[in-house]
Amino acid sequence: DLHPRVRRQREMCIRDRQEVYYKHAADGQKEYYKWLNEMYNEGILDPEFATQTHEDFVLKVAEGRVLGLLDEEWDYTGAEISLRADGQEEHTYAGLPVTIDRSVKCPSLKQQNLAVGWGIGITKSCKDPVRAVRFLDWLCSDEAQILLNWGIEGVDYYYDENGKRCITEEDLEASRKDTNYSERTGVGFRVYPYPSYGNQSVDSTGNSYSKSSREMVKEGYDEMEKEALKAWNVDMLTDIFPQKEEFSKDAYSPLWALTLPDELEKMLVALDNVSWKGLIECVVSPADDFDAKWDELQQNLKDAGLEKADREMTALLRDEISRRE
């Protein structure tokens, strides 16, 4: 199944770390969409992929009707919780590092640079701006980070005899099967978009700030996931992916985090609109018509300002890199 969020096509490809290309005119995209076209014509791809709402998509996943999907894990986690609550662990998902080209490594675990496109502001009407800043400062403290991620000591977590911060089996089970767990308890509910440490960061006691640490993830695996670990002979499900050490760290923020000039933003919106219509036509066309549909899409993208958008995005990237040097 394809998540309807593919309507938001604003993704760019970076070649040789200096050149930016609009994704749907970049190398490799034609092969990918030709594969989708083949799956559509074979009846494997959901025929409603282009018309369903996000709610439709999530409901299908939650009902165990979707064999495989292309999506970010955070977007379907709630549906997986529903599957576990219904005893349908066999219908949950394990990520696979699949790429169209075997020579290309799946970069899911690649370490990203700091995203600095968003900021924090204090309004003129704030009655106590000093207190507001102190609150933001407190959010970065161990006390606040533990509260946001773990909850209240003695209620949501405890320390064992070795000083390890733990949650009960009941809470672990609830966090995996209750879709309202975070909202009901407050645990993890306000971590994003506030300041937070990475999953492997530890506090002054040596315990992880996050409940998504390697150790906590392993403790939370269900029986189906444990069977996969055994079959793949790995310690964690992510061990089958290329590890972050296999990639160089980019010297720039993720492009989605950059603030774009209004004119460039409008150009990208126009390209997105052309892409959404044209990609649907490519995917649902008879196989013999795919090449012609793809060529038509590429010409329409050029007419919509593709080359200018690529140049301006490349200039933004190079400016970002130069500021960090």
Label the predicted regions.
Residues 1-10, 14:
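Single conserved hydrophobic/aromatic residue that forms the stacking wall/gate
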Residues 15-27, 101-110, 159-183, 314-325:
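Short, solvent-exposed loop/beta-turn-alpha elements that line the ligand-binding surface or hinge
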Residues 18-47, 97-101:
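Glycine-centered hinge/linker elements that transmit conformational signals in sensory
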Residues 50-59:
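Short helix-initiation/N-cap motifs at beta->coil->alpha
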Residues 62-74:
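Alpha-to-beta junction loops
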Residues 79-107:
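Ligand-binding "clamshell"
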Residues 115-128:
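A bilobed periplasmic-binding-protein/Venus flytrap-type ligand-binding module shared by bacterial periplasmic
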Residues 146-284:
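Conserved small-residue motifs centered on glycine
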